[in-house]
Amino acid sequence: MGLLTGDALFSVAVAVAIFLLLVDLMHRRQRWAARYPPGPVPVPGLGNLLQVDFENMAYSCDKLRHQFGDVFSLQFVWTPVVVVNGLLAVREALVNNSTDTSDRPTLPTNALLGFGPKAQGVIGAYYGPAWREQRRFSVSSLRNFGLGKKSLEQWVTEEAACLCAAFTNHAGQPFCPKALLNKAVCNVISSLIYARRFDYDDPMVLRLLEFLEETLRENSSLKIQVLNSIPLLLRIPCVAAKVLSAQRSFIALNDKLLAEHNTGWAPDQPPRDLTDAFLTEMHKAQGNSESSFNDENLRLLVSDLFGAGMVTTSVTLSWALLLMILHPDVQRHVQEEIDEVIGQVRCPEMADQAHMPFTNAVIHEVQRFADIVPMGVPHMTSRDTEVQGFLIPKGTMLFTNLSSVLKDETVWEKPLHFHPGHFLDAEGRFVKREAFMPFSAGPRICLGEPLARMELFLFFTSLLQRFSFSVPEGQPRPSDRGAPYLVVLPSPYQLCAVLR
């Protein structure tokens, strides 16, 4: 067969272009509906991919919000997307219309991670019986963790003591606390999943943290959005082989830990941890093809909990210490409350939180100000729904701009500043605000919220009970502007920890 001539090539190119334009027009039809949300005009074949900075999506969405309003539409190649902004619209979408908006979109790149067809996990699971079963199990396991043995609070308290000991080794010298915070939170998750902790210099924990950090960068890239929007590209071997390599390495390490752990499981013994509890449910469900308790779901659930549970809490703690050295008056007030309620002898306990309104307000304000997951996890509509009068068709990817709620000028007195008074009334009592939703809202609210609250309170109070933190002498004042990725990290900084 001979090569195509120039005229033939031109004809083929024109035919392909016409075909792509027709496909593009077909996918744009819903944008012409009377009540479909407005939005920027998509580029044929690309949609609005080039108009969104995926490393700082919240910033892009804020600019588009000023132009198109609280509910606007985008198109990622041929995937319809709606972005919801502001407290009223986000609450309507996630809470009032939760039955319609709690599904998850299919992300084709996830097929490269090596999980079988029965694996959904919890975070990315479709809104249905399997998700309900796994969420119920996970919430119950977190609540009943260590029944008859060490409680989860004991694990966190003991790890806080190890963290303080590690900080003591750096006392008086400038250092970056990020790595130590990562290791401490990693050990809490490891105790929950594997009933074990790692020494801070263990090569396994160092590799886990390295792969997790790289995974954040991978998932923040435009490349991932393009591949999820044009999954046909994943059929190209050289493309598929390079996608999500760090995440695959992270999963492989977790698989190794899981295999080591499972050799010690005994069905007739009380569960040591969440994994044992899952294996027990698998044992009970043998022969039940409808059960979501299977090996592949266990692998994905472990990776979900390890990744999401570790990163968000350690990053928030890193923000907390940064804000304490930038606001020494707030730090002193927290320490005064710690001294009054807890003292310098015993360890902090969760029961102390109710008697420490200022400290509680500071922790909440750290979460609000840091705003570390500004766009949340994407949802998908499972049927036609309405938000703020706009019609959102079934199968639309839905982003909720949580940053627009946490920084809403109509709700917060000083939305762009660190101000613990946002969570205190005139008498100094703690007040939780409706617009405080760093964990999202509705049925898909982060299932690890109770654990995160416990870790933040116990680690934060333990550190400020033992140390005073400051900007190292001779160093410039660090910035309180974050570095946007999938999770907003604080700009690199060092501090000095001085024993009190």
Swiss-Prot record:
Tissues expressing the protein: Expressed at high levels in the inner zone of the adrenal cortex.
InterPro entries: Cyt_P450, Cyt_P450_CS, Cyt_P450_E_grp-I, Cyt_P450_E_grp-I_CYP2D-like, Cyt_P450_sf, Cytochrome_P450_fam2
Listed cofactors: heme
Keywords: Endoplasmic reticulum, Heme, Iron, Membrane, Metal-binding, Microsome, Monooxygenase, Oxidoreductase, Phosphoprotein
Classification via Gene3D superfamilies: Cytochrome P450
Reactions catalysed, as given in the entry: an organic molecule + reduced [NADPH--hemoprotein reductase] + O2 = an alcohol + oxidized [NADPH--hemoprotein reductase] + H2O + H(+)
Gene Ontology biological process terms in this record: arachidonate metabolic process; xenobiotic metabolic process
Keyword Signal belongs to the record: no
Main location: endoplasmic reticulum
Subcellular location: Endoplasmic reticulum membrane; Microsome membrane
EC number: 1.14.14.1
Classification via SUPFAM superfamilies: Cytochrome P450
Signal peptide residues on this chain, from the entry's feature table: none
Coiled coil (residue ranges): none
Modification sites for Phosphoserine: S249
A Gene Ontology term for the protein's cellular component: endoplasmic reticulum membrane
Mode of membrane association: Peripheral membrane protein
Residue numbers binding heme: C446
An MF annotation (GO) of this entry: heme binding
Highest taxon in the source lineage: Eukaryota
Functional note: Cytochromes P450 are a group of heme-thiolate monooxygenases. In liver microsomes, this enzyme is involved in an NADPH-dependent electron transport pathway. It oxidizes a variety of structurally unrelated compounds, including steroids, fatty acids, and xenobiotics.
Entry similarity comment: Belongs to the cytochrome P450 family.
PANTHER family noted in UniProt: CYTOCHROME P450 2D6-RELATED (PTHR24300:SF1), CYTOCHROME P450 508A4-RELATED (PTHR24300)
Protein name: Cytochrome P450 2D16
